[in-house]
Amino acid sequence: MNYLDRNEFNFEPSQKVVEAIKNFDPKTLCFYTRIYDQGKKSVISVRLSEIYGVDESQVLLTYGGEDMLKNAIHYFLSVNSQTGAPNTKILIPEFSWWYYNRVASECGGTFEMYPLHEKEDTFAYDIDEVIEYTNRVHPRMLLLASPNNPTGNGLTPEEIGRIMENIPSDTMVLIDEAYASFISTDTAYIAPLVNKYSNLIISRTLSKFYGLPGLRVGFGFIGKGHDQFESYINKYLGYNRFSEAVALAALDSDEHYRKVADDMEWGRQLYKKELGSLPGFKVYKSVANFILIKYPIAIKESLMEALKVQEYKIKFMGDKGLEECLRITLSRKEQTQVVCDTIKKCYLQTTAQK
């Protein structure tokens, strides 16, 4: 089965990752890490500190980006750390990952959805609207997804800075950047932002750009002054030492993953060229490892069957407002070609029957 429905990695891991796995000494697992004795969390956090220019104490490590989101939302929606008064509201973008809502509900939090706007062939945040909405509601948390799943749009560093500068300083901002780096390689904005704004968390992962969702390594960066949260999220006895070895190899393999990102760009252009001009289709711009496509709903059943026969799975969206959309993981060229050709063939067959 070809899984193009969960934004996984249909490519080979880097050679450095393969070698790290082959050369890992199983005896290492018989002992805890000793780096915590040096006042550090992990060899991963030390390396991330070097790469991103953020103090190691402000680097967060979790078991996947999912764990980062859950820890942050559960912690900050429980009790307002400054006043002791409960403030359980979080603002979440419309047309975003359903998991955000569920995590907020798990800890008794309440959520409101703020608008994400469709503009021609893209979705976009209205920055002034986000600022106005946040000031009016004054939530404990504001969640921004950049890139956003499933719409594929992102925020610029300038837009993030404008939001941070103009909202209440006691609203904790959580930016989910799980799908970052496929288009822009800029990370220089992260250190200045987390050093300037104490109410900011930027969450990333090795699951998407680095193609290791099965490794379950998430990381992030937090503004200064959150010792209690850092203690809450850190692991006293350290982290999975096998994951550490593989993660270090992945972080040292950018050249490999940039080539993969180039193949994904080829896929974006193929979908745009082959499907974008067909009546009833709209191929949305995406800066993530997936693409959202609006399609004629009349071909849904035949398309599902055709993909099933060829052992391909893509995401048929069911979210309100996106019921006529497909989300397809960008994958190897031959896989992309099969999916694109199948969609086009189903469309042409359906229109020929009318």
Where in the sequence are the language-model features?
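Active-site phosphate-binding strand-loop segment of PLP-dependent enzymes
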Residues: 119-182
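Conserved PLP-binding catalytic core of the aspartate aminotransferase-like
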Residues: 265, 275-310, 326, 330
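N-terminal small-domain helix-loop-helix segment of the aminotransferase-like
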Residues: 1-64, 68-71
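PLP-dependent aminotransferase class I/II
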Residues: 12-14, 107, 199-277, 281-284
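Short acidic capping loops at alpha-helix termini that bridge into adjacent secondary structure
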Residues: 55-59, 86-89, 170, 177, ...
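PLP-dependent aminotransferase-like
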Residues: 77-140, 144
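PLP-dependent enzyme catalytic core of the Aspartate aminotransferase-like
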Residues: 158, 309-310, 315, 320-354
